[in-house]
Structures are given as structure tokens and as C-alpha cells.
Amino acid sequence: MDRGLSTSTRIDDEGLRERNVASQSTSTLSPEALTATGDVELKDKTGKDCKTFGRTPDGTVFTVPQTHDMVSQLLSPSEPKNLSDVIVLAILGAHILLLWQLPTGAKVPVFAIIYLFWRAAYNAGIGWLLHNQSHHKTLVRWAEKTKVFVNPATGKNPHPNVYNFFKRELETKIPHDYSFDEAPIEYNTWLVFRRLVDLILMCDFVSYCLFAIACSHHPVNESVLMTVLRWSAGIVLVLFNLWVKLDAHRVVKDFAWYWGDFFYLIDQELTFDGVFEMAPHPMYSVGYAGYYGISLMAASYKVLFISIIAHAAQFAFLVLVENPHIDKTYNPPPSRKRSAEQETGSVSSRTADSPIAPTPIDEQIPHAPTFSSSPPQSVHELLGLHNLDLYRITDTSSVLIQFLVFALTVLTPSTPWYQFLFVANAAVWRLWFSIGVGYMLHRQSNHKAWTRHFVKYGETPQEAWNQWKGTYHLSMIMCYASFIAAVWKMYNFPADWGYGLVLLRHVLGAGLISLQIWTSVSIYESLGEFGWFYGDFFFDGSSKLTYNGIYRFLNNPERVLGLAGVWGAVLITSSGAITFLALLSHILSLAFIQFIERPHMQKLYGQSLRQDAGLVKSLKKSLPPTLRQLHGSVDKIFDESFEFIEEIIETARPKLANGVNTFVKDTTALFQSYPARVTISRIDEDLAGYDSRDYSLEVEGTDSSSLAEHDQSTGREGANARMPLDRRGDLKNLVFEYGAPIRVKWTAPLNHSKKDWIGLYKVTDNTSREVTRVSSQGRWIAVNEGAYDNLTCEKGIVKSDVVIKATQQQDGDKRDLATGEVIFSGDKLFWTQGVFEFRYHHNAKHNVMAISRPFEIRIGRYEEEDDHELTQASVEKSLLPVIRSCFDRDPEIAPEAVDEPFGSLVERDGKFAKRVVFAVHQMFGVEFAPGVVQADGTVRNLAWRVCNAKRVLAPYSMSRNGASTPTERKE
């Protein structure tokens, strides 16, 4: 329902992202993308509404008739009514009657259960349907299989009564521009789906309101003023919520309100305004303000907590269902550039300024640093637990420092003296994080002081950048760790949670902390590591400014939302000392933005800076002219105040500089002196009449190179075992390439079940030859199309049910058989080495009818060569087919030549890089992180890195066959 995209949207005509993201690739949505999400309002030149045209996945174009929102359809007397409306209204009336009939003590628990049921039906039920529709077109396939939309006159519809019911219901609701028989099946399916949505959403809202009524009461000893304030705030929030919903529906219309783009797309020009300029995902963020307003009016913590649960479930729905569909539908990776399409600069990028491919001078002088003004590729990022690397001094220091702070906080008493020390420590670190770090960035912006220091000692700008990231990271960690320690010392556990506003303060405080965490994550997702660490202070980035993510709505989210958690701590502790720290933090953060960030942005981008963000513009539009003038006057006062402060600082700067220089010299001299999953196997009972001899599987694949066979005789065997293998037959071992597609030919009786399927398993996973007892984990393909309600299991079907006449069979059998072919590739393969088999299963169950010959997937170990140039070329030659297989041989991802760049999907989906590093490790004995593959970008760069790594590791290798990572080598 919340179809206003808030991330990865490019707004080129408005300029700024308050910190430029030079090294991060930005996904750009086409107008069709925003159109399809429903942020549209099509008008002709005269301002009148025009017809809307829809487009189904198969390219069918149709007229989308005008429809109305659910409330109007149900309650407006001017709208036509049908049986489904009566059913919905009857169910809503039953809810109200139940509240009236239940005894007082049962109302709250009963309606809590009812509301949670409808909320689960919304987020889990509708979410499951939409997820499957997005990935497998399940709802449309159900309609196709049941043929409920096929005219019974054709004789193909086994459910004529259902057809007549749907036809009457839908044509009653849409009297103009709609014909049930002529509309595409996707559109009819969507119309039926939205009737289900109407029922669930209306029951969800009504049951919530009834639950709030059941819980509502007047608090004991509450003053009249507090009651008036509570109800006034609640009413304001509800009215604001109502405006958000109405304005959102005005913008997105019914198409996006009912998730129409899961079924079809519409062709329209777009407008992007209203509530979608105010907040990301307004339907799911600020669109739930009314829940908290109702909680205030009900004066019930039960209503508040169930509102929080509902809000959290809605965000889970957004993250798990809507966002993946948006990315898949509207953010496809850009097409990969071929070698012929690349510019000369791209082809010759591996020159002296490349950290990957060395020049001959670099070969002669191995320690000569390379200098580049371009931002470095981020391979080993700092932020996030998943990037924690204890081999890195920055991460080790961070962990040790946090452990030390935690230990001191827990082990010391909470006496006034220790409380003062911890608060003072937090204040000092906040001063350092804002003023100290700000001073260094100011010097870097104006004089490149930080970079000059490292260049002075022969280091590269990249080294200066890495050291800066470590310094900033440690400063940030100490700032917040010391603040948390001070909060811990000042916090007193409540003796009575029901006293006064204690519980409310904790709930609001936790909410503000969560808001700051979400804001920080959103900022990092928008800026990337380069922007997070102020990379445009160190490298010349792009002069083009873009707004995406949270910056579409706010110029500086750090200004308010970025410190919400600090004020949450104030609410939780109710401490004057923590209030002082919060004020100090906020003032210093505002000063940092005003005196450090803004001047640098103005110097880099000048007039292209955006003055008002989306939220500010929306608020200004809603203000009367007099208040707009007042807003301008206030802005002028603030600007003049900041200019006055800047003049004072400029006057005092020489004295401060002398003092700082003396302090630095003295300090320098001083330092120089000192789950388990359960799988249930379903056994079919109708196997009678099927002969397993009529079933067979034949496997074909790309044979592995001869390098894989060299390990069969390693010298570790006995004398007899070293002899050539004596085969009593003409069948050789099946050894296939890693990641190469595998073709499976099957035979079965003519009357085999259309729901038969073939799965891929490790040989050691199944002890039974009759029943498969482990999950295929998605590695299966149906033998016939249309048998299952998803499309994934049909990917790989080549042909099905080709009849083999009795005279065509080689084994003398006189029965006709059916045959077919499927191809296992990509995610349907095991991306590891081992011995595997295919199993043919009967009728969507796990009864095994045939098992293929076992086959081995093996990665051949690379043989060393002495000459470096030959090694470089041969490594490239060996890597290219492996990498193509790792990239599913997709022409949009996999390179055709060693100098072609990888497709952009390699950066977005980490599985491809992980496949490559596993293969490289097995082939060459060198272990890389997946980010290395993404950063290298071509087979040639990766081959050079492999050769260089092997030369570096050669002195430490204990392998007689060449360099490898010693501790990882397994014999």
C-alpha cells in the first residue's frame, strides 16, 4: 500500500545530498518505476483526467477503469453495492455486536485476540500472497488453473457458478470502461484480491478501534488540564493520520493502494508531491500516528503496546514484501558494458593510478606507492558487526576499548564522585568528537592537512584515507560508549513501573533510541562508507549532487533525528546530568554542521545546494503567507547569529592556533620520550500400477578439466592402488565443472503424474533409496509446466512428455514412454565440491522412482608455471570459464573476455562473489574476501591479484606445488 519509493530515487533538478557519495553506485529509478508505484496523477493539457492504460507482463495493453477507495465503496450511498459489500458490513457489524454482548472482563482479551488475528491476516496473510505473486505469479496461476475467469460457454470452465458470481460482483462495482470477459486475467485477479484486502483492512481497523474502546478509561487523579491536553493531542494525531491517508490516496490512487504493480503496470506520467515529500514510506511511518493518538485518548498502555506491535509488523511487511518487489521490478541492474562499448579511458584504466594492475615501473620498484585522486574502492568496510575483523587494528582497538569502558562502568560503584567522572568523560569525548574531529576536517578541507602529513612521509592518499577512517571510527565509538556509560551510572531502576509517567517515559525513550538507530542506518545506506567518513574532504568526487534515501526528505537528518536517542536517554533517566550531555551534544552537532560541513559543501557545489528539503517544502506549502514571512525572518536571525559567531572565531583563531601548536609540540615530545529444520516425507499411497523400471534419469554436463584427475594418484596410496583403475564396463566416472549447467534427461510412463519432480541431492544426504528424507532446498524442477503454483520450479524445463514409441526403445520394451529434459543451473546447483545425484519423485511427494548415476563436482587445482607472463595469461585463461559459470553464464553479468567488466548485479548480490572466491581458493590455494572480486571488476584484475598473492605467499608456502595460504591448505 505504501508505494511512494523513498530510497534510490534520483532527483537531478534539485541538487544536494548534504555529503557527496562519490564512490557509491546510485540506483536510478526511471519514470516508469515511480509511475508503477503509484505516485502518479495523469492529466491532459486542459487539466482533465485522462484514461489510464495498463500493461500486463506479457505485453497486453488495456484500459484501466476508474475505481474508488474501500470506504467509499462500502459506506457511500452513491456507490453501487453488491453481495461482497454486504458480507463485509455484516462482519463489521458482528464485531460491534460482540463488543456490546461480551461481559466487561472478557472484552479486552477477546478483542486483543481478534485484532491480532486480523493484523496477522494483513501482514502475514496478505504478505504471503503478495510475496508469492511477486516471485511466482501464484495468484494469477491459481486463476489460470481453476479457469474461474473463463466463459463457461467455451466449455472449459468447471466452475460456472463462481464465474457468474465474480462477473456480477465486479461489473456491478465498475460500471464504466470494464468488461469482465475482455479484461486480462491479471486485472481480474487483482480485482478479486482487492475485495479480500477490503475485508481484512476494514476488520483490522474496526477491531483495533473496538479494542481501544474496551480498554479506554479515565486515569485516577488526572487533572482537567491533563485530560484536555491528552485528548487534544490524540485528536490532532488522528486528524493528521487521516490527512496522510487521504493525501496518499490522492497521489497513488487505487492502483498502488492495493499493490496493483504485483499484477500489472500502468503507463502514465507522474507527479511526486504531497505526503510523499514529507517522510519515507508515509503510509507506514507517519501514517500510523493515529494509532498513538487513539492510545492517548484511551489512556491505556495496552492500546499503546498493541499499537507498537502493529507498527512493527507493518515495517516487517515493508522490509520483507514490498521493498524486495520494488527492487526487483523497478531497480534492475544496469546493462553490463561490453569491451567494445567501453571508452578508451576505461580500457586503459589499469595504469599507474590503478591499485590493481601494476605498471612495469611498479614491477621494478615494488615499494613505490601509487597516487590517485580518485576515491578508492571500498572492499573491507568498517561499520557493522558483519564487517568486524579482529586482524584489523581499528576493530581490535574498538572491541578492547568498549570492553574496558563496560568493565569500568559495571565494576565501579554509582556514587556521586564516579557519576561525575563518567559524565565528565562523556562530555570530553563529545567535545573531541565534534570540535577535535571538526578541526581536523576543517584543516583538510582548506589545506589538505591530513593528506599532506602522510604524503610528507612517503605514504599515499589512500593510506591517509584509511588512517582517517580509523581515527573517526574510534572517536565515534568512544563518544557513544562514554555517553552510554554515563547513562548507566545515572540510571535508577524504577521501584514501581506504574507510578506516574515512568512506563511512558521508558516507552518513548526506547522509541527515540530506535529512531536514531534507524536514522543512522538510513544515512549509511544513502551515503555508503565514503560519505559516512566524509570522503569528499579527501578525494575529488563528482560535482553532481543527488538526493536519495532519507536525504530526499531532510537536508541534514543528523540535525534532529540523528540525536533522537540522546534525548531518549534523557527521558529514561530523568537526570539533569544526562540532559546537560544531550544539550551539549545537540549544540555541538549543529555547530559542526554549520561551521564544518556547510562551508565545505558550499565550496564544492556552490549554487547547486538545495535550500529546502522535501519535508520543509511540504510544510511551507501548508503555511499561510504570514507564517511564511515569519519563517523567513527567523531564518535571517539565525543566519546573522551564526555570522556573528564566525566573526568571533575568526578573531580568536590566531591565538587559538598558537596555543594548539604549542600543545601539539609538547605532546609530540612527550610521546617521543613514552535452527534446525524438520522435514516430513509424504509417502503416496497410489504407487500401484507404476513400474519403477519405466523411470530413468540420464545426466549430461561439462566434463571437468584433466587437472581434476591428477589428484587421484597422490603417492599416498599403497602399491596396488597406484595402478590404473581396472573398469569392468565402459562407463567412466562423471566429473563435471564447478557451476556448469547440468542437463537431465528423464523417462516415465505415459500416465505419470504431472506433478512429478526431479531434485538434486548430495549422495550422502539420503540413506534410503525409496524415499527422500531431506529437503531439496530449492534445487528441484517440475517435469511439466503448470503443475505447481510458482514459476521458479519451472525454470529449466526444456521439453516434456515427448512420446517414445515402442520401436524406438533400445531395451526391447514394447511400452510407449514419455521423455523430457530439464537443465539445472544457477541457484538450483550446489556451489561446492562433492558427489551428487538426481532423484525422480512421484506426484509432488518424496517417493523415489529413479536415481541417476552419481557424479562429482570438482574444481581442478591449477598447475604452476615458472614464467610470470605465461602464468598471468594462463591464470586468466583458467579463471574466465570458471567465473562465467559462477555468474550463471548470464550475458548481463558474465564477461565474454578477460578485460570485460562484471555486471553490476555482482555488486548487489554477494552470492556471485562468494562463488568466485571459493573457486579461487580451491584452484590456487589463495583465499580472498568477496569484496575483492567486486572491487577488481574484471578477470584480468583478479588474475593479477591471484598471481601477486601467490608470489607474496611463496616464501611461506609449505606446499611443494607452489604458493598457497599455509593454514588453509588441506591435504
Swiss-Prot record:
Domain of life: Eukaryota
Name the record gives this protein: Phosphatidylethanolamine N-methyltransferase
Compartments, record wording: Endoplasmic reticulum membrane
Membrane-spanning ranges: 86-106, 110-130, 196-216, 224-244, 278-298, 301-321, 390-411, 418-441, 474-494, 497-517, 576-596
Function: Catalyzes the first step of the methylation pathway of phosphatidylcholine biosynthesis, the SAM-dependent methylation of phosphatidylethanolamine (PE) to phosphatidylmonomethylethanolamine (PMME).
Cross-referenced InterPro entries: Phopholipid_MeTrfase, Phosphatid-EA_MeTrfase_fun
Native source species: Aspergillus oryzae (strain ATCC 42149 / RIB 40) (Yellow koji mold)
EC number: 2.1.1.17
Residue spans, topological domain Cytoplasmic: 107-109, 217-223, 299-300, 412-417, 495-496, 597-971
Alphabetized GO MF terms: phosphatidylethanolamine N-methyltransferase activity
Keyword terms, alphabetized: Endoplasmic reticulum, Lipid biosynthesis, Lipid metabolism, Membrane, Methyltransferase, Phospholipid biosynthesis, Phospholipid metabolism, S-adenosyl-L-methionine, Transferase, Transmembrane, Transmembrane helix
Reactions accelerated catalytically: a 1,2-diacyl-sn-glycero-3-phosphoethanolamine + S-adenosyl-L-methionine = a 1,2-diacyl-sn-glycero-3-phospho-N-methylethanolamine + S-adenosyl-L-homocysteine + H(+)
Chain ranges on the Lumenal side, renumbered to this chain: 1-85, 131-195, 245-277, 322-389, 442-473, 518-575
Location of the region described as Disordered in the Swiss-Prot/TrEMBL record: 1-30, 330-359, 699-723
Lineage, broadest ranks: Eukaryota, Fungi, Dikarya, Ascomycota, Pezizomycotina
Cellular component aspect of the GO annotation: cortical endoplasmic reticulum; endoplasmic reticulum membrane; perinuclear endoplasmic reticulum
Skewed-composition ranges (Polar residues): 21-30, 342-352
